[in-house]
């Protein structure tokens, strides 16, 4: 069905999102920081990346540029505990597919992943 990489330093969030996304039939990979996230991206080539904004070794907003440079056809969705309009705008400028707040948008995660997956799948098929 597709591959999703989750980059988040909160173990509970990683576990919860992995379970929810995995139950939808996606193959899920996890990373707790930017460095491991980049390694997972290169090794597993996911169509969609969910990335926390605040990571122990960097900013998810800045990481979007690196992820898109390495895998331009993969779609990145940023997650944050606190909605921040300037971060959201910068994330989109850096190439993010979307930017959502954790908790408030739990019911939006799966439809958003499905839309991002569809866009990435079409892009990969036209490559």
What residue ranges belong to the model's regions?
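Short hydrophobic/Thr-rich beta-strand motif most characteristic of the beta2 strand and flanking loop
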Residues: 25-34, 40
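Acidic catalytic/metal-coordinating carboxylates
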Residues: 32-33, 59-62
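The feature encodes the CheY-like receiver
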Residues: 14, 56, 80, 84
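Two-component/phosphorelay signaling modules centered on CheY-like receiver
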Residues: 2, 11-29
């Amino acid at each position: 069905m597709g591959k999703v990489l989750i980059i988040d330093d909160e173990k509970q969030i990683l576990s919860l999102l992995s379970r929810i996304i995995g139950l939808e039939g996606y193959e899920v990979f996890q990373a707790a920081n930017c460095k491991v996230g980049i390694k997972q991206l290169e090794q597993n080539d996911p169509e969609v990346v969910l990335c926390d904004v605040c990571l122990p070794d960097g900013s998810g907003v800045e990481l979007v540029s690196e992820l898109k440079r390495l895998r331009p056809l993969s779609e990145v969705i940023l997650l944050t505990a606190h909605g921040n309009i300037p971060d959201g705008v910068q994330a989109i400028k850096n190439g993010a597919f979307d930017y959502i707040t954790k908790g408030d948008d739990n019911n939006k995660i799966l439809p958003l992943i499905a839309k991002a997956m569809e866009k990435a799948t079409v892009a990969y098929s036209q490559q």
